[in-house]
Regions:
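A cross-family acyltransferase "interaction/gating" segment
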Residues: 134-192
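Catalytic core of membrane glycerolipid acyltransferases/transacylases, capturing the structured
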Residues: 44-98, 160-161
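Alpha-helical membrane-targeting segments
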Residues: 1-26, 78, 100, 143, ...
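Membrane-anchoring hydrophobic helices of lipid-metabolizing enzymes
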Residues: 1-63, 88, 107, 203-212
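Alpha-helix C-terminal capping segments
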Residues: 59-63, 85-86, 112-113, 141-147
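Short, hinge-like loop/turn segments at secondary-structure boundaries
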Residues: 84-87, 109-110, 166-172
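Catalytic-site beta-strand/loop segments enriched in glycine and acidic/polar residues
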Residues: 105-140, 144
Length: 212
């Protein structure tokens, strides 16, 4: 018999585990000043990372408030509740379900936040392929008029879930994790269709791999 626990209980346990692990992990953040300068000027940003490296980002909520686009699936429901418990806002949708509504919700939150609310997207989620970016993050950045910021995480020691599609990385206790932000760059509205959009996706992938 397969036991399915309520999403609320699962999210409570996972949020508690997150806080416990984070107490033992040393975080180092690189190239963060450029983002802070944009936020201070009232300019929101959209941070783009790979799905397997998302663990450390909610820890940065003290400097800003994040709005993350999360899948509308049941697994996404659990993740959204975990993020909410950690102080991260969520817009529900994905590449296949309710994506446009989620984009609009995130854009509205970022515009109203004027630099105090910033977007966060795992660009190869929610189902992969691993390290292959989708175009949703580009649409979000262009519609919100927000610079796009590629970001990577490198941990000295981590447990890798090798059977997961993304090979998710969970930092081990007493490891050091580097959050590395790339240079913010603009996504022109003209890059939202056709070959220009495909080229913009490849550019984002190259920038992410270049951090890594």
């Amino acid at each position: 018999v397969r036991l399915r626990l309520p999403a609320g209980l699962v999210s409570l346990l996972l949020a508690a585990l997150y806080r416990l692990v984070l107490l033992t992990v040393r975080l180092r953040v690189e190239n963060y000043d450029a983002l802070r300068a944009l936020w201070a000027a009232g300019t929101p940003t959209v941070v783009a990372c790979w799905h397997n490296e998302l663990f450390c980002f909610p820890a940065l909520r003290g400097d800003t408030r994040w709005v993350a686009i999360v899948s509308a699936s049941r697994d996404g429901e659990v993740l959204a509740r975990v993020l909410n418990r950690l102080g991260v806002d969520t817009a529900r949708g994905s590449s296949s379900r309710q994506g446009l509504a989620a984009l609009r919700q995130a854009v509205r939150a970022m515009r109203e936040g004027a630099g105090r609310v910033n977007g966060f997207v795992t660009v190869d989620g929610p189902r992969g392929p691993r390290h292959k970016a989708k175009d949703g993050v580009l649409l979000l950045a262009a519609l919100a008029g927000a610079p796009l910021v590629p970001a990577r995480v490198r941990c000295s020691r981590a447990f890798v879930f090798r059977k997961a599609w993304d090979r998710f990385e969970l930092p081990l206790p007493f490891s050091t994790c580097r959050i590395v932000f790339g240079r913010p760059y603009a996504v022109p509205s003209g890059a939202l269709r056709g070959q220009a959009l495909a080229d913009a996706v490849r550019e984002l992938e190259a920038r992410l791999h270049g951090l890594g």
